[in-house]
Amino acid sequence: MATPTRWGTPADVLRLGRVSLLTDISSEMIVGVFALCFTTVAGGSTALLGLVEGLADAAAASLDFWAGWWSDRTGRRKPFALAGYGWSTLMKSLLLASPSVASLATFRVLERLGKSVRGPPRDAWLAAIAPEARRGYAFGVHTALDKAGAVIGPLIAYGVLAWRGATPATYALLFALALIPALASVLVLARVAERRSPPRERAALRVAWRALSPQFKRYLLPAGLVALGYFSVGFLFLRARAMGFAVQDVV
């Protein structure tokens, strides 16, 4: 087991938290301006933006089951997490090219595949690292670092936009800067030691469904209805811009 830190959680939990912190800084620097860049610089329609965002959300969940199943079957966590974070970083490099509808749409959808691959194995890795009595606290620390990145990223974007103005050159600068924390996250993850779990078979989906409690199954219905009302935050950014907010204030 990893040595506890002064925060009362294993050091590797904090390392994985730093990975999420850096990744979210990178991603949120991009997400804050993506919709505006897609529609105003690349010339994409809002309808097409909605399609791209929908495909991106689908991609973000498309490989969850496979990644979790294969991670359990092999007893490995780090290769899946490293592949997911590495893939997302690689896709962000597409933004270095001249922005077009095709390149921006390709980035947005393919980059989310990395999230789908890394999510379940990383969470299983966290659960294996943390002491059982403090597992909830360990996940809380990791989530806090993740959310901190989601705050820092837009603040950086705000500063760059306020300094340089909302121009195509500024968007290109933001996309280039976003690669720095993304690359750093992969380097940090590469240094985290992996403790392999014993390989185990995962129950068939039908068997696993039957094992779920009736209360949980009833919860899925309202949760699904709430999800149906979800809309891309990009539309909120566009609406705020149309109402007269400055681009940096929208971010």
In which residue ranges do the predicted regions lie?
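Helix-loop junctions at membrane interfaces in 12-TM secondary transporters
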Residues: 94-108
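Helix-to-loop junctions at the C-terminal end of transmembrane segments
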Residues: 63-76, 161
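C-terminal membrane-cytosol helix-exit motif in multi-pass small-molecule transporters
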Residues: 179-200
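Cytoplasmic helix-loop-helix junction between adjacent transmembrane helices
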Residues: 107-147
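Helix-loop boundary and gating motifs at the non-cytosolic
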Residues: 3-61, 216-251
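Transmembrane alpha-helix termini and helix-breaking/packing motifs in multi-pass membrane transporters
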Residues: 36-41, 152-175
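Structural signature of the two symmetry-related core transmembrane helices
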Residues: 79-94, 179
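Residue-level signature of mid-helix packing/kink "hotspots" within the transmembrane helices
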Residues: 57-65, 150-151
